[in-house]
Every structure is written in C-alpha cells, then in structure tokens.
Amino acid sequence: MRKQKILIVLFVGSLVLPGVVWAGFSGRFDTENNENRKLAEFPEVNLESLGDFPEQFEAYYKDHVPFKNDLVKFCNFIDTEFFRNTKIGDVVIGEDNWLFYLPEREGENAMADYQKTNVYTLEQSAEIASGIAKVRDWFLDRGVKQFHYYVAPNKETLYSKYMPEKPKVIGIGDSRMETFAKYMKENSDVEFDFLADYLREFTEKYQLFRKYDTHMNNLGGYITNEKIVQDMTGESLPIEDIQVMIGTKPCRGDLSRMIGRYKELNDDREYGLNYFHDGIRYKVKKEESEGGEEILKVFKSNSENEKTLMVIGDSFRLR
C-alpha cells in the first residue's frame, strides 16, 4: 500500500512539479520560437467553440510545454552525437555541420527535388510554362518593358558536396528544375533563367549560402543581383572588382535554430562588401500586413538610371 502511495505521489509530482518550476523560473530558460512556423495560441473559451477546445488546447500545450526547447536540444544532441542521425525534422546535417532544409510534404517537398523523384511530365511543364507566359503577357499589356523569370537554386543544389551519404539521389539525369529549364529554353519565348549553372561557377572561390541558414549570404545576393542588372541594363559590376571582407560576428541561421543548436553553431561569418556603386544612396519604405508580415519594400535612390524594377518572389528576393 505504501509503495502504491509513493508511486502515485511521484506520478502526480512529475506532472505538477515541472509546471510549478516553470512558472517561477521560465525567464531563466530558452523560450524562443525555434520552429519555422507560428506557434499555437491559447484557445478562446466560449460556448460556441467548446467542442473544439480540447484539440486546440492540446496543440497549445504541445507548443508551450515547459522546458520544451531544452528537451528538444537534449534529444537532438543524443540523436546526432550518439546515434549519428543526419536528419532532424526537416533539417539535414551534412559534412562540417552544413545544414540543409529538406521537408517532405505536399507542396514543399525539397527532399523529392534533391532525390530527383518528382520530375515534371511534358504535360505538367507545358501547363506551368503557359501560366508563366500569361503572367508575362499581363505585365506587358500594362506597359512593363521587360519581364524576366528567375529561379534561384536550393542550397543543396550548389553545395551537394556537403550533403551526407543519406539521403541518396535516386533519380538518374536532370532534376525537376533542370528539366523544366530545358523545356522553357526549347518551347517558350519567356525570358527564363535557372541560376544553378551560373552561380556554380562562383562556388569554388566564394561561399554563396549561409552555412546554418536556408538563404544566400551577402556574396550570393550580390552575385545574383549583378546577374539581373546585367540582363536588364547590359552593365554590371563584377564581384572581383569590389572589396569583400569577412565579418567577425557569428552568422547564425534559421536551420540551427530549428534543431536547437542556434548558439552552439557559431563558426560561420557574414561577408561585407565595399567600394561598389560609390555615391549611390537609397531610402527604403516598408509596408506590412495587419499581422505584421512584410508585404512590400519600396527603394528610391539617387541613381541616374530612372528605370523602375519590380521584384516579386519569396524570401530569397530580400538577399
């Protein structure tokens, strides 16, 4: 009987004690959102939504359970250091701790892209090409002088040498985007560029992506930008003609945050660029949605070039 009471006390204590400790000392622990999504909020309590409350509260509790980040960090450490796992959630850990983002879900399956298991059929390529052409025509009909469609390569495309042995590339031949780029070149009059081959020429001399992030660094952004400028104006300032400096502060990233090693992985550096386009100054006006998400940036400069450039894209456009 006494043994049962002790077990009951230990069980109840294991449920209650973490919450009590957390309530008093949560400020001393890591409580940042380390996931690439918005965490669930505490659900509203009312008669209309009472039936949904248990499920919504469970989602909230899972996202805000006490010591979550520290527990995740510990589990990830065990996975990588003892069991030598190279994939934690959507993040693949490569050579020299290079991190890659390879989710496997509908609409965002970078893993299938890397493994070359999702190559477009001719019918799919034709449908997508037709959609791009319609967008191009819509802009041209409204006075736009030039329309160009660029596709930036994924990090694992340029830096596959740092990928681990698993996951293995399954498909033979071109990837989905390589196949589609060839289709566009042979069957469409849209100005289209998949930038993998262009950027690959620079990877031996320069690091173009942040080691622990999904995005390009300043070097990758500059080289890509000058490619666009060259296409649009016929002029550019090659990166070889400017001063490149290595920063001194750690360049951390979203991927190291996602696996709970944001502070530990600190050997990467951002690059500074000097002596380019001297005398050019610009101002930036930002517009945000009601939720605080940035939806528009307007740049104005003192450049003699009076042309207007509009860039529509994902987070890579900010580099």
Regions found by a protein language model. Give the residues of each.
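Extracellular glycan-modifying ectodomains
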Residues: 1-319
